[in-house]
């Protein structure tokens, strides 16, 4: 246990000088006991000086304070004692319910599983959300990204997925709140408590108001807890809200560490940092991690380096579109932009595949005809095109669905739609069985039978 002293403090970056024979290693944790602050070593500058990032506010620090080297990376509690608790980046409880009382602690920096230990993900995971199950099905042990700009419903979709999967799937879940609103964290905690699944969820928060060090490392803290459950042979769910804030924290830290920025001001190590995190989120022969990650898209630009780097790592991408949200269709998933590796006749079966492609084909044709309709009106279309447009508008409305977590706001009870019913319903619309129903009947209903009932009342 060597001791050093602080020599320079610039925001969240603190330089510490140690005796030359006992310089701490990169990623080792240091403690400033006077203020109870943990630092993480990022660079060795030579002459016994290391550059560190503070895992907390650096207010009240001054030069010459004593710093202790713990001789190991940051470690956090793992295991069943973390369930039902809210912890911060260091694994300290923040829910005022006493110590975690863990039996084991793991380092947050770990190697990704070896290539021969990985197992492919092909089993489907039903979410009960029509548009997702039909167009971009999720795999058990797969990685899913929810992409969307500000205010199109990433967090609400995430909450609904957690509600549907966590209540239907009886395993453990870990939720990492990375740089999101504290209010959402609080809402989420109460949502879990009310649906009686809190005792199966570990919550790790590093919110918007935290220093960049916390936001950069909190994703790793949550991931480490999920990895422990996976190594025990369980199938665990990992929710991360929001991956973009992880990148953003990296950008803030990178600038403070004095690195040259790359495109759009991001850190030069963007792809590597993303890879280090994403390669650990994977399924092995022992157990699986199914991860659902919200990805904020700055200014609705999917080609921005941050979302673009995330795309490469995912099995399924659910793209939320502002144009669809403007029509009042929620979930605002874009069925033409969202993709999934699972949408393959060998995995989902021929019928599901054909129905999904027919739905997309109809919507694509409608999109192409929109300009003609805007200029010349519906009357100028051929009979066949009129029918396509009418069906596409029904499909578009039928892709909306009332959510359980949004009941309070919408006043309509949530619906969980099994995959079989989803496929049959859309097959019927595409084949023209419901051409006689008005399109309003398809808006905000669960199954097709509800649409038929609704049509009778109109």
From Swiss-Prot:
Keywords: ATP synthesis, ATP-binding, Cell inner membrane, Cell membrane, CF(1), Hydrogen ion transport, Ion transport, Membrane, Nucleotide-binding, Translocase, Transport. The gene is atpD. It comes from Nitrosococcus oceani (strain ATCC 19707 / BCRC 17464 / JCM 30415 / NCIMB 11848 / C-107). This is ATP synthase subunit beta. ATP binds at residues 148-155. It comes from the Bacteria. The keyword Cell membrane applies. Its EC number is 7.1.2.2. PROSITE patterns: ATPASE_ALPHA_BETA. InterPro entries: AAA+_ATPase (IPR003593), ATP-synt_VA_C (IPR055190), ATP_synth_F1_bsu (IPR005722), ATPase_a/bsu_AS (IPR020003), ATPase_alpha/beta_chains (IPR050053), ATPase_F1/V1/A1_a/bsu_N (IPR004100), ATPase_F1/V1/A1_a/bsu_N_sf (IPR036121), ATPase_F1/V1/A1_a/bsu_nucl-bd (IPR000194).
């Amino acid at each position: 246990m060597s001791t050093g002293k602080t020599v320079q403090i610039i925001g969240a970056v603190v330089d510490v000088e140690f005796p030359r024979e006992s310089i701490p290693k990169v990623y080792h944790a240091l403690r400033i006991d006077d203020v109870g602050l943990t630092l993480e070593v990022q660079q060795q500058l030579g002459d016994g000086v290391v550059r560190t990032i503070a895992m907390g506010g650096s207010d009240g620090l001054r030069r010459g304070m004593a710093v202790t080297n713990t001789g190991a990376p940051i470690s956090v509690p793992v295991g069943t004692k973390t369930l039902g608790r809210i912890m911060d980046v260091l694994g300290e409880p923040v829910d005022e319910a006493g110590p975690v009382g863990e039996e084991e602690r793991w380092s947050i920096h770990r190697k990704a599983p070896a290539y021969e230990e990985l197992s492919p993900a092909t089993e489907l995971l039903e979410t009960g959300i029509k548009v997702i199950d039909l167009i971009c099905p999720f795999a058990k042990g797969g990685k899913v990204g929810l992409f969307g700009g500000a205010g199109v419903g990433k967090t609400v979709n995430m909450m609904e997925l957690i509600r549907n999967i966590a209540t239907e799937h009886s395993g453990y879940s870990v939720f990492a709140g990375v740089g999101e609103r504290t209010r959402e964290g609080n809402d989420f905690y109460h949502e879990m408590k009310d649906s009686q699944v809190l005792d199966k969820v570990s919550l790790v928060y590093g919110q918007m108001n935290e220093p960049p060090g916390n936001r950069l490392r909190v994703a790793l803290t949550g991931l480490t807890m999920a990895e422990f459950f996976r190594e025990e042979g369980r199938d665990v769910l990992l929710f991360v809200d929001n991956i973009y804030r992880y990148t953003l924290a990296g950008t803030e830290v990178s600038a403070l560490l004095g690195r040259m920025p790359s495109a759009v001001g991001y850190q030069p190590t963007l792809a590597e940092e993303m890879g280090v995190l994403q390669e650990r989120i994977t399924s092995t022969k022992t157990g699986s991690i199914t991860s659902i990650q919200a990805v904020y898209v700055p200014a609705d630009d999917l080609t921005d380096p941050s979302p673009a780097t995330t795309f490469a790592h995912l099995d399924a991408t659910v793209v939320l579109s502002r144009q669809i949200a403007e029509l009042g269709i929620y979930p605002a998933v874009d069925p033409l932009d969202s993709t999934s590796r699972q949408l393959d006749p060998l995995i989902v079966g021929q019928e599901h595949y054909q129905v999904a492609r027919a739905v997309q084909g109809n919507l694509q044709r409608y999109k192409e005809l929109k300009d003609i309709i805007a200029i010349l009106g519906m009357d100028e279309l051929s009979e066949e095109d009129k029918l396509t447009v009418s069906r596409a508008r029904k499909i578009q409305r039928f892709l909306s669905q009332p959510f359980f977590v949004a009941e309070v706001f919408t006043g309509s009870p949530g619906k969980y739609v099994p995959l079989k019913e989803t496929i049959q319903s859309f097959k019927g619309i595409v084949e023209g069985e419901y051409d006689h129903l008005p399109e309003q009947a398809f808006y905000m209903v669960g199954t097709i039978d509800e649409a038929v009932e609704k049509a009778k009342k109109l």
